[in-house]
Amino acid sequence: MNLQQKVFSYLSKLQAAFTAAVTDIITSTAHGLQDEDLLQFTTTTTLPAGLSLATNYYVRDVTANTFKVSLTKGGVAVDVTDTGTGTHTFHLKGKAILTDGFEHLELGVNTENDANLTIKFQVSYQDDAPDFNAVQSPTNQWDYVDIVDTEDKSSVDGDTGLSPAGSDDNRHFAVNKDNVRWFSAIITSWTAGTVEVNIKSNKSYS
């Protein structure tokens, strides 16, 4: 049994401005998002009614410039009842990937469009998927994890993360931890560009 999952796609913008209509349709030109991408929203003033801060939403009904969101994967579209005020921004978040039963987890990290950002990698051992975008707690257990570059064996500290600064690259890493049940990644700062993160393993515990 093999594991191969995508945490981020380089096609998806990591953040961008959007508007929302009472038809529940969110518009953001050439957003690049895909169905089931995970988002959170911020605003300079007030979000459209029906959308909340610090809340995870799943993308659905994608077109080139529009999409809707739901509170659960494949769920009912959120009912947007006004357009809000100010400038609104979506932020792409990493999905929780179930890695239980696999060892020697490997990462492919590919940056595009002169990426200037910081990305950190997260793991959890709890039974149910944690909310990697919420504060750590006894009921939401996760931590940042160290990764090792397979080219030169250099280590990237989990609390520091990986910070490409305008020079795109394709890099491979090993996750420096076994017995991981859940894995994800989070963008902690962003100026430009996109990133694709794939996790894989072809070795499972017997």
PLM-predicted stretches and their roles:
Residues L47, N110-T118, S189-V195:
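Extended, low-complexity, turn-rich repeat/linker tracts enriched in Gly/Pro/Ser/Thr and Asp/Glu
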Residues A115-Q136, V197-N202:
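Short, surface-exposed beta-strand/strand-loop-strand elements in extracellular ectodomains
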Residues H31-Q34, F102, N113-L117:
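Short proline/glycine-enriched turn/loop motifs at strand-loop junctions of beta-rich domains
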Residues L39, G101-E112, I186-I187:
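A short beta-strand element within beta-rich, extracytoplasmic domains
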Residues N2, A30-H31, Y125:
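Predominantly extracellular/luminal regions of secreted and cell-surface proteins
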Residues N2, K6-L11, K93-F102, N140-S206:
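Beta-sandwich interaction modules
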Residues G74-T81, Q126-K153:
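Acidic Ser/Thr/Pro-rich low-complexity disordered segments
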Residues L14-L92, W190:
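Small/polar beta-strand repeat architecture
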